[in-house]
């Protein structure tokens, strides 16, 4: 289901039967409708970015709800798929902040220690936030709590009001939070553009001796 270190730590935070409840939920929703991402990719963020290698968290709300978009990594789509509006704005801000990146697939960020986590890990086709409040939030809150308990600094990048509410879970003063409005077209011009999250994260990582992320890779 998840990388073993994540699993071991998360199960210490959740009620004992919570993984079983998640599996029952997944069995039901995938058997009765079209759900994204593909089931094999539901936990991809935790599989690609091991706990011990996580340096940055970028928190999304839920997966893209159109065909072939969601990969199990927040904001990412395959390179063969047009960038959705929020991702277009993320790449526009990246270009202004550091440089041009010509890929829509953000897997290389995840492989460098950027945990691309959605607060809800599944979504019904065509229904944004359709699985909100059903099963996922305690699980993904547990992920944040596990990171909060780490004794090595993590940079939490929180975009938009929903993600910024999770700041209450980040109580360990060793960590760093970068927050701004969401990259959605509805809010990007209210402070996301010009917020320079990528260079700011790298400056923090460099200062902490953790090495920079190659955001253009």
UniProtKB/Swiss-Prot annotation:
Q: Name one GO biological process term.
A: base-excision repair, AP site formation via deaminated base removal
Its protein name is: Uracil-DNA glycosylase
PANTHER family the record matches: URACIL-DNA GLYCOSYLASE
Q: Name one GO cellular component term.
A: cytoplasm
The keyword Isomerase belongs to this UniProt entry's keyword annotation: no
User: Where are the active-site residues found?
Assistant: 62
| HAMAP family associated with the record | UDG
| Gene label | ung
Write down the chemical reaction(s) this protein catalyses. Answer: Hydrolyzes single-stranded DNA or mismatched double-stranded DNA and polynucleotides, releasing free uracil
PROSITE patterns per UniProt: U_DNA_GLYCOSYLASE
């Amino acid at each position: 289901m998840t990388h073993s270190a994540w699993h071991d730590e998360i199960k210490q935070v959740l009620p004992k039967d919570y993984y079983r409840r998640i599996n029952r939920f997944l069995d039901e929703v995938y058997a009765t409708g079209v759900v994204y991402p593909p089931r094999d990719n539901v936990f991809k963020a935790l599989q690609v970015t091991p706990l011990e290698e996580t340096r940055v968290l970028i928190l999304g709300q839920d997966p893209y709800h159109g065909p072939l978009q969601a990969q199990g990594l927040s904001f990412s789509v395959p390179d063969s798929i047009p960038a959705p509006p929020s991702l277009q704005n993320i790449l526009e801000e990246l270009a202004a902040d550091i440089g041009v990146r010509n890929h829509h697939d953000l897997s290389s960020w995840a492989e460098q220690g950027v945990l691309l986590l959605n607060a809800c890990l599944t979504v019904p086709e065509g229904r944004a936030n359709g699985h909100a409040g059903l099963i996922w939030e305690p699980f993904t809150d547990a992920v944040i709590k596990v990171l909060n308990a780490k004794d090595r600094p993590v940079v939490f990048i929180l975009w938009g009001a929903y993600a910024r509410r999770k700041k209450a879970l980040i109580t360990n003063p060793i960590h760093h939070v970068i927050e701004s409005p969401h990259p959605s077209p509805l809010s990007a011009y209210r402070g996301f553009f010009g917020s320079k999250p990528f260079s700011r994260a790298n400056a923090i990582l460099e200062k902490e001796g953790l090495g920079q992320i190659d955001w253009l890779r």
